[in-house]
Each structure stands twice: as C-alpha cells, then as structure tokens.
C-alpha cells in the first residue's frame, strides 16, 4: 500500500513553516500498519499512490482545480470546509503523530540552500525556520470553545473539554511542547492539565493564544510560574472588552513583570471606518500602559479581506507594519514611524504611510492627538 500525504499549505504558501498535525497523525497511523508513506511535494505525484490524503488549514491556499474528493483522494481541514471540517477517525485522531514525516523535505531544503549559498551557508541559523518540525511535540490537550466569536473558525463545539492525554502526542526526545488548544483556560480541568505539562520539565507554549478574559489569580499564578516557551499570547479582539481586559492586565502584572506578553489585536471586522481605527489605537494604548506587545490581525473572511476595500487601507497597512515589529513598536510612536518612512522616501511627495497618517489626522484630529504620539518606552510598570 502506497500512501501519499499532501500538506496543501506547504505547497501553496511559500513562507509557510508549521507542520500539519493531521498529516503527521495520518502518516503515523499508516506506517504502523506497514504502508509505504510519502510526503508529496507535487500534485503530479498523486498518480503514483494508492491513496492520497490532502489537508489544508488556510482557506486562501490555492490547489489545482482538478483536485476533487474521490475513493482515492481524501480531503480535509478548515481550509476546505471552514467550520464544517469533519473530524479524523478516532483511530487516527488519537494516534501518535509521525514527527519525521517532513524530514526528507527539510533535508532537501538544506541541500538547496547549501548549493546556493556555498561557504556562506550557516546551517544553525537556517534551521531555525524548521524548529516546529524538529524540536516540538505538538497536539491538543483540550478542544472546543464556548465563545462562538463570529470571526473565528472554531464553531464546532460550545464548550471546552479534555481531548487527549499529553502522552498521546508527547515525544520525550523532543526539546519542547506546542499546544494547539482552542481555549485551554476554559477547561475546568486546566490545572491538572497544566501540572502534567510542568511535570515533563520541558518548555511549552500555547500557539493559539490564551483567553485573557478567564484570567484569575490562581490561573495567573499557575501560568507565570512555569518553563514557558516564548511569549505568552492572549487576544484583545473587541474594544467592548476594554474594561475587563484592563482588570485582567492588573492581575497579570501582579504575577509577572515580563515583557514577553503579547496580544492579538483584531481590526477590520466590525467595520473598516474611522471608529475601527480609533478602537485599534485605544486597545494599543492600554497594552502599552501594561508593557504588552500587540500583533495586529487584519480580518479576513475566507478569501475576502474587508480592510482592503476601505478608504483607510493604507492606514491599516501602516498600523500593522508598526505594531507587528516589536523593535519598532517599542521605540517609536506611530507618528515617528510614519515620519521615519517618509525620511526613506526617494521621490517627491509623501510616501503612502505618511499620506495615510496625515489624511486621517486631518479627518480625525482628536484621535490623532490622543494616540499618535504615544510611545511604548515612555510607560513604566
């Protein structure tokens, strides 16, 4: 039996660098049954296989038009079915992932880079992009979320529940653990699950972020006293949660002074007007006050991005370029960032960033006065 596996996002997104967990579980399942399994790097290889599994996470990842589900071709993932994506069969869903599925592809990428860079090739720095493939055990301890946010793909469940024991996907030879849980803190068994992670003595992270609104003293004390890997990531999606998030930030700062606290900040969802821009800056100002970093998320509905049709399109771009680069966000106000872009502009007139700022300031001077000159480094904990 020859099984082909296609990670559609790997093929269709040039800079995509994260393993597809479903692909790894399917590979592990079939290898245990003696099948020959291969990660396909071209859709042209489908003909050489008895069965092919194609998984896609992102809705805008392109695939050939002729690819259709059949007895031979099995397709799954949110990229195809959004919130209606069918579950894997239990025997596959709860199988140990094959963490070596991508090994041959990684080695090919290394050899290609060596051939191009020659003596200048630095393998250690080159391999950083593959760290999730090589260093992490990856999986879900819990599944589900009760929030039902309209912008979120996670609509299948209305509660959070234990999904897999850690041992189901934990490889002790790997350096770290990456959790893909939808809303870990929403599970009533969060403390027991956290204790199992701590017991491994391995650094771990929640890639999908954590629900700031559920932070309590006990949760904060538990979270900020572990070997955490990288930034603690939360979400500040709605300005309507401003007072609640403010309260929770105070709790966080009782237990950690770390600046490795980051928030996803959703923009362009409820509207793409001046009020949405103001609401974005209002949230960013609060995060600055508590020395947290933002990551601006411009809303995309499958393949449709409303902000791209907004009169403030250039301002949304500038906002993300400023907010999503910590080295810049920490040192420059929004106005300083726009002025720095203008200083690099080589033709007459204003660059798009400076022009967008000036036009908005002319239209909404009160908002500009309140927020455009705020600087992260001016706030102290």
Describe these PLM feature segments.
Residues 31, 198, 285-289:
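Anion (oxyanion) recognition and catalysis
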Residues 60, 177, 227-232, 240-322, ...:
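Conserved C-terminal portion of the radical SAM core fold
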Residues 53-57, 153-248, 259-269, 293-297:
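Core AdoMet radical
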Residues 73-116:
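Ser/Thr/Gly-rich flexible loops in soluble cytosolic domains mediating phosphotransfer, phosphorylation
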Residues 1-84:
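A short, structured N-terminal alpha-helical element that caps or precedes a catalytic domain
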Residues 2-8, 12, 31-42, 47, ...:
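Radical SAM enzyme core and accessory elements
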Residues 16-22, 131-168:
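Canonical Radical SAM [4Fe-4S] cluster-binding loop centered on the CxxxCxxC motif
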Residues 1-4, 36, 135, 148, ...:
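Residues that mark the start of a beta-strand
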């Amino acid at each position: 039996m020859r099984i082909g596996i296609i990670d559609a996002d790997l093929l269709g997104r040039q800079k995509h660098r994260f393993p597809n967990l479903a692909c790894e579980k399917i590979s592990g399942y079939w290898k245990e049954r003696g099948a020959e399994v291969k990660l396909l790097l071209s859709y042209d290889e489908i003909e050489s296989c008895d069965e092919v599994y194609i998984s896609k996470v992102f809705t805008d990842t392109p695939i050939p038009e002729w690819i259709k589900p059949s007895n031979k071709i099995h397709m799954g993932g949110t990229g195809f079915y959004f919130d209606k994506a069918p579950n894997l069969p239990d025997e596959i869903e709860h199988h140990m992932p094959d963490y070596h599925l991508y090994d041959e592809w990684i080695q090919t990428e290394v050899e290609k880079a060596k051939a191009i860079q020659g003596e200048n090739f630095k393998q250690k720095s080159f391999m950083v992009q593959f760290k999730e493939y090589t260093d992490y055990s990856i999986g879900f301890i819990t599944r589900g979320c009760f929030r039902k946010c309209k912008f979120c793909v996670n609509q299948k469940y209305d509660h959070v529940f234990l999904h897999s024991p850690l041992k189901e996907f934990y490889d002790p030879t790997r350096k770290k653990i990456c959790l893909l849980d939808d809303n870990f803190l929403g599970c009533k068994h969060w403390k027991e699950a956290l204790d199992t992670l701590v017991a491994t003595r391995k650094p771990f992270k929640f890639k999908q972020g954590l629900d700031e609104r559920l932070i309590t003293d006990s949760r904060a004390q538990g979270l900020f006293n572990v070997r955490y890997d990288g930034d603690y990531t939360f979400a500040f999606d709605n300005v309507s949660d401003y007072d609640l998030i403010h309260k929770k930030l105070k709790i966080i700062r009782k237990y950690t002074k770390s600046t490795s606290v980051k928030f996803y900040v959703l923009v362009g969802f409820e509207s793409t007007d001046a009020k949405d821009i103001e609401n974005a800056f209002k949230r960013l100002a609060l995060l600055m006050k508590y020395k947290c970093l933002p990551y601006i998320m411009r809303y995309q509905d499958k393949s449709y991005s409303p902000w791209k049709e907004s009169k403030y399109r250039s301002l949304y771009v500038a906002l993300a370029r400023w907010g999503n680069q910590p080295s810049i966000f920490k040192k420059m106000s929004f106005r300083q960032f726009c002025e720095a872009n203008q200083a690099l502009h080589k033709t007459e007139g204003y660059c798009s960033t400076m022009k967008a700022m000036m036009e908005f300031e002319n239209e909404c001077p009160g908002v500009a006065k309140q927020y455009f000159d705020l600087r992260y480094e001016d706030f102290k904990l």
